[in-house]
């Protein structure tokens, strides 16, 4: 077929979608009594993939994506008229999907989308094989093949943040004097 022998590829169109969806939803709850005030929040974030999806016949979908859920809870207990105990808990769980062994500084797919000549090869030929340019002297790499065949990696990150505060108003001894003790613990698991 002539289009396979003499390709004219818009690599940006072949590699990227017109747009990527991103959304964020959250729910907050607050209230309290004379003894306790509370605030709670849950948030979900989804970042879609800008790269087009191609069948790689390997049983997985390569590409990019990110999902994260956050939670927060703040409780303020009025133990006495002059003593307040505060508990603040927050955490998140995130999953980042990338092609296997992809780093944050790897821009090769972007570079080749704008640098590969339109007549170098087709992204995918009619027999299902990916285009390949044997001499890479002109920077002709097939980013469609790279993204589709590079595997898929999911990196999870879990964060837990806590702080506990005890405040004692000593205004009865010295006007405006308050003593505060704070304990906090932050953990990140990757």
Residue ranges and their predicted role:
Residues 3-43, 47-51, 62-141, 153-156, ...:
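Flexible loop and strand-edge segments within Gram-negative outer membrane beta-barrel domains
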Residues 40, 87, 164, 179-183:
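Membrane-embedded beta-strand positions of outer-membrane beta-barrel proteins
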Residues 55-61:
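Short glycine-enriched, charge-decorated loop/helix-capping segments at active-site entrances
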Residues 145-148:
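Surface-exposed, low-complexity/disordered Ser/Thr/Gly/Pro/Asn-rich loops and linkers
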Residues 175-177:
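Short, Φ-rich (hydrophobic/aromatic) sequence segments
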């Amino acid at each position: 077929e002539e289009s396979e022998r003499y390709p004219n590829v818009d690599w940006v169109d072949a590699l990227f979608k017109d747009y990527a969806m991103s959304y964020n939803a959250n729910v907050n709850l607050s209230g309290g009594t004379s003894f306790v005030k509370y605030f709670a929040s849950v948030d979900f974030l989804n970042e879609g993939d800008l790269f087009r999806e191609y069948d790689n016949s390997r049983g997985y979908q390569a590409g990019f994506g990110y999902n994260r859920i956050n939670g927060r809870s703040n409780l303020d207990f009025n133990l006495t008229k002059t003593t307040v105990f505060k508990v603040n808990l927050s955490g998140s769980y995130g999953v980042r999907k990338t092609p296997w062994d992809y780093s944050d500084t790897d821009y090769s797919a972007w570079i080749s989308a704008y640098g590969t000549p339109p007549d170098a090869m087709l992204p995918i030929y009619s027999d299902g094989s990916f285009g390949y340019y044997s001499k890479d002297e002109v920077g002709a790499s097939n980013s469609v093949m790279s993204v589709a065949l590079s595997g898929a990696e999911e990196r999870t990150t879990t964060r837990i943040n806590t702080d506990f505060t005890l405040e004692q108003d000593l205004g009865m001894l010295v006007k405006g004097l308050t003593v505060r003790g704070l304990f906090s613990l932050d953990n990140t698991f990757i």
